[in-house]
């Protein structure tokens, strides 16, 4: 498609409307390169992607993608065997992480049926080994200490040396305060110094590094810290060297995967671009138009995208219709209507939503040509008419039946009679060539051409004779008429002059009356359509109100049922507590054996009313929690014993997992790590008690995990667990309750305090869960 039409219709300004929605530099580059397409399947694919994104937002109400810098230049540098700096590696790390997040997001899209985006999601690849290694680069672009043992050693030594220097200088600040111009430790050339008064410079032995501009202060590095500062300088050099070595190693890790990473980055950027199109469509009440296969155009309530308060209009350009001629006076909005059609076509053929209502339809043109406004060439010293005619000649030479042609004020700039004749001849040529054309003109002769010629239709812009102002409403099928007499009368021209003028134009009076009648019919039709639309809007509002009331009612009902359930549970808990008290008294009196107490307690539990809530749909819906999923390669984890973050890289045959933690590979069982994502931690726990054999052979240990449980559910499981532990003669058990809000932990503590079979309990050691777990000794 020719680029001139993009400039004439200011298509770049339309593209700029999408910029605020973009988060990645890749999508910004894609927007910059966006141009109209001439192949219907490609346009359809773009529209399908927007429809898919709409389905995602309906299901999830969001589509999370982080800001990503362009990594194209960094990938080129890798291909040239150049090492990347820390910021470039951080940008690639974010792409790898975003790719992994997007793959997990796609796997959770259960109720979305895709037409196009599924292929993009499925082409994303994960790099668990790379992600694990890249944990050594934090989000601030800093290499963590654990990036290598050598780096950790250097930084630890550097910290110690700096602390010693600081301590020595702080002691000197106190001892030599009267010799100093300021009570602070300064830095010159990367070395710690003291600001000494020039008059006392000989009182402190050391190296002078700087003198203040006034000469009153000398910055001295005391001899006591010279050696330490030299060590620090050397350690910093060693640190830079080690960091360079690590960055080189990271660059080498990336090189074999450049093509795949580049593809991932493009997919993420394109998904961001599709997201931006959807948000633009949603915010501007735009639509995805249908694509006609017979050059039919139908734009319903179409608006100009660059105007702040555009008037919506309907435009129908049927297959058989070749030309629409908009007649009438200037300043009525004819040119705006012309540009609105052109921009709607450009946006649609570029795969963008069109500012129109559902049901709109675009055609696919190989080219769109326009002669709009005064494009007079000063260099060529051409008149307005010559400039227009030169452009029109060029259009007529290039346009074919797959083109759309837009003419503004066709035939203007010359003798009206000759200009009108030229305009009709040009339109006739285009009509016979089956080239769709929309033209504006103020020549009345073209009204007759539109009425008398097949496949040509008149149109006009509505004018309010009462306010003497245009309404900018497009009236298709109604030719424009002059409002000169009405305007002149309202502005105070003598009635006899207006009457005389009318008598001079009697030959046109019949035509004007017909036009007036057509206008009246069009206005009445529009009034009825507006009324129908108002009724439709009222119906929509009513439906929304009914849905809102229903949702509020359902919410209140669920709350009441939950409240009733909690009250019932409290009654049961009270009864069980009373039973514990009774059993305690019995045991104190009769010294019953533990298993006899458990049997008695079971009998008392049977006395509580067993209400079957499993079939209660409301409670099931309220309590439904997404089933736990197994870990998978690429998941981010926290190693429980160390608190370090890592990434799962592979699963061994025996069920254990290999994980990359910094630059260290670890082999872990599934209970030695937890998934990072909070929403994946809230899973329904298996009520089975796992007995773990201790390595020292001190006997069996049982562990109960209460994390993620409701309070009452946790207390019931704890009670049952202690009973079973007593029956199995277990001496010690572990209760994992987590830290969280502390409610479960407090409940566990209270229960253990009042249970006479608990000999001792305390929080676990720090390396075994700390205050998130309690070790219980039974007896």
Swiss-Prot record:
SMART domains: MUTSac, MUTSd, SMR. Endonuclease that is involved in the suppression of homologous recombination and thus may have a key role in the control of bacterial genetic diversity. Acts as a ribosome collision sensor, splitting the ribosome into its 2 subunits. Detects stalled/collided 70S ribosomes which it binds and splits by an ATP-hydrolysis driven conformational change. Acts upstream of the ribosome quality control system (RQC), a ribosome-associated complex that mediates the extraction of incompletely synthesized nascent chains from stalled ribosomes and their subsequent degradation. Probably generates substrates for RQC. ATP binds at residues 328-335. Its EC number is 3.1.-.-, 3.6.4.-. It holds the Pfam family MutS_V. It comes from Streptococcus pyogenes serotype M1. GO terms for molecular function: ATP binding; ATP hydrolysis activity; ATP-dependent DNA damage sensor activity; endonuclease activity; mismatched DNA binding; ribosomal large subunit binding; rRNA binding. Residues 704-779 form the Smr domain. InterPro entries: DNA_mismatch_repair_MutS_C (IPR000432), DNA_mismatch_repair_MutS_core (IPR007696), DNA_mismatch_repair_MutS_sf (IPR036187), MSSS (IPR046893), MutS (IPR045076), MutS2 (IPR005747), P-loop_NTPase (IPR027417), Smr_dom (IPR002625). PANTHER family: OS10G0509000 PROTEIN, OS10G0509000 PROTEIN-RELATED. This is Endonuclease MutS2. Belongs to the DNA mismatch repair MutS family. MutS2 subfamily. Keywords: ATP-binding, DNA-binding, Endonuclease, Hydrolase, Nuclease, Nucleotide-binding, RNA-binding, rRNA-binding. One of its GO terms (biological process) is rescue of stalled ribosome. Homodimer. Binds to stalled ribosomes, contacting rRNA.
């Amino acid at each position: 498609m020719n680029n001139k039409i993009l400039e004439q219709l200011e298509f770049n300004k339309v593209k700029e409307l999408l910029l605020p929605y973009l988060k990645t530099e890749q999508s910004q580059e894609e927007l910059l390169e966006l141009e109209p397409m001439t192949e219907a399947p490609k346009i359809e694919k773009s529209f399908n992607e927007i429809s898919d994104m709409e389905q995602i937002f309906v299901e999830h109400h969001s589509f999370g993608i982080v800001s990503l810098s362009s990594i194209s230049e960094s990938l080129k540098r890798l291909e040239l065997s150049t090492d990347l700096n820390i910021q470039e590696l951080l940008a690639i790390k974010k792409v790898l992480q975003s790719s992994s997040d997007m793959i997990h997001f796609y796997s959770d899209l259960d109720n979305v049926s895709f037409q196009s985006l599924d292929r993009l999601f499925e082409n994303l690849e994960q790099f668990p080994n790379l992600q694990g290694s890249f944990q050594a680069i934090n989000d601030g672009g800093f290499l963590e200490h654990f990036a290598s043992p050598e780096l950790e050693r250097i930084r630890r030594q550097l910290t110690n040396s700096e602390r010693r220097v600081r301590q020595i200088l702080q002691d000197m600040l106190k001892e030599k305060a009267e010799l100093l111009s300021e009570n602070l430790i300064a830095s010159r050339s990367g070395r710690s110094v003291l600001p000494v008064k020039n008059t006392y410079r000989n009182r402190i032995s050391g190296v002078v590094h700087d003198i203040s501009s006034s000469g009153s202060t000398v910055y001295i590095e005391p001899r006591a810290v010279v050696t330490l500062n030299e060590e620090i300088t050397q350690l910093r050099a060693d640190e830079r060297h080690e960091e360079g070595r690590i960055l080189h190693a990271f660059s080498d890790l990336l090189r074999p995967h450049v093509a795949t990473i580049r593809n991932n980055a493009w997919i993420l950027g394109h998904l961001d671009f599709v997201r931006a199109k959807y948000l633009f469509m949603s915010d501007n009440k735009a639509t995805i138009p249908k694509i006609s296969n017979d050059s039919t155009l139908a734009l319903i309530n179409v608006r100009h995208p660059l105007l702040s308060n555009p008037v919506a209009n309907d435009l129908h350009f049927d297959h058989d219709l070749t030309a629409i001629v908009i007649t009438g006076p200037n300043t009525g909005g004819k040119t705006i209507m012309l540009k609105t059609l052109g921009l709607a076509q450009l946006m649609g053929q570029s795969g963008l939503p069109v500012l129109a209502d559902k049901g709109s339809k675009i055609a696919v043109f190989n080219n769109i040509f326009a002669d709009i406004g005064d494009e007079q060439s000063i260099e060529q010293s051409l008149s307005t008419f010559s400039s227009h005619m030169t452009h029109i000649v060029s259009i007529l030479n290039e346009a074919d039946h797959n083109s759309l042609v837009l003419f503004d004020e066709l035939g203007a700039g010359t003798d009206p009679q000759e200009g009108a004749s030229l305009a009709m001849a040009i339109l006739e040529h285009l009509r016979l060539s089956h080239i769709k054309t929309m033209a504006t003109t103020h020549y009345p002769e073209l009204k007759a051409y539109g009425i008398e010629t097949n496949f040509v239709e008149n149109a006009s812009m509505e004018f309010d004779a009462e306010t003497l102002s245009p309404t900018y409403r497009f009236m298709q099928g109604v030719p424009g008429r002059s409002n000169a007499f009405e305007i002149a009368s309202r502005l105070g021209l003598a009635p006899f002059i207006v009457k005389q003028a009318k008598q001079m134009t009697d030959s046109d009076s019949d035509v004007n009356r017909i036009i007036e009648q057509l206008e009246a019919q069009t206005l009445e039709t529009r009034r009825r359509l507006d009324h129908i639309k108002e009724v439709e809007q009222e119906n929509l509002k009513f439906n929304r109100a009914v849905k809102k009331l229903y949702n509020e009612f359902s919410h209140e009902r669920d709350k009441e049922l939950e409240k009733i359930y909690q009250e019932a549970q409290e009654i049961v808990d009270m009864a069980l507590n009373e039973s514990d008290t009774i059993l305690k008294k019995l045991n104190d009196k009769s010294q019953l054996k533990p298993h006899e107490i458990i049997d008695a307690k079971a009998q008392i539990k049977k006395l509580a009313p067993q209400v079957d809530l499993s079939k209660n749909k409301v409670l099931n819906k309220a309590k439904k929690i997404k089933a736990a999923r197994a870990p998978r390669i690429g998941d981010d984890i926290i190693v429980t014993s160390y608190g370090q973050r890592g990434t799962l890289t592979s699963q061994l045959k025996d069920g254990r997992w290999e994980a990359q933690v910094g630059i260290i590979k670890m082999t872990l069982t599934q209970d030695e790590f937890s998934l990072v994502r909070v929403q994946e931690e809230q899973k329904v726990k298996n009520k089975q008690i796992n007995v773990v054999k201790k390595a020292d052979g001190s006997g069996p240990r049982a562990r109960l995990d209460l994390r993620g449980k409701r309070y009452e559910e946790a207390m019931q499981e704890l009670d049952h667990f202690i009973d079973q532990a007593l029956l199995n003669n277990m001496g010690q058990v572990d209760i994992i309750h987590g830290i969280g809000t502390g409610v479960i932990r407090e409940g566990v503590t209270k229960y253990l305090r009042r249970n006479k079979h608990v000999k001792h309990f305390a929080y676990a050691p720090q390396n075994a869960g700390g205050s998130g777990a309690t070790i219980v000794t039974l007896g």
